[in-house]
Amino acid sequence: MYNIVMCMDEVITGFRVNIGGAQTVLGVTPDLCTMGKAISNGIPVSCVGGKKEIMDCIRGNKVLVPGTYPGYGLGMAAVLATLDELTKDDCAVYKQVFKVQEKIMDGLVEISRKYDI
């Protein structure tokens, strides 16, 4: 509509709030998306994903994408293992995390009421 590229930084939110990141929760489809160590369970990795027409610019060497360890084995193995775990049993890990999160939040609310905070 506006002829601009919409980029979404998912370095903090990617894979932490949902397997599809904040973009899934918010119902947004960016043209480009950045992700960080959550995709590899803390192993130093970063990545960029996006729509085919934009990613084709990278694939065709029209855009230089430098990096410290681009595509290194340990990082890529960590990504695959992390994604396997996060998607196991219909993403059950997220349901468990949200259940625990709700208990923690309920406890914090109770404490804040008790001490009039």
Model-derived segments and spans:
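Conserved N-terminal phosphate-binding loop of PLP-dependent enzymes in the Aspartate aminotransferase
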Residues: M1-I117
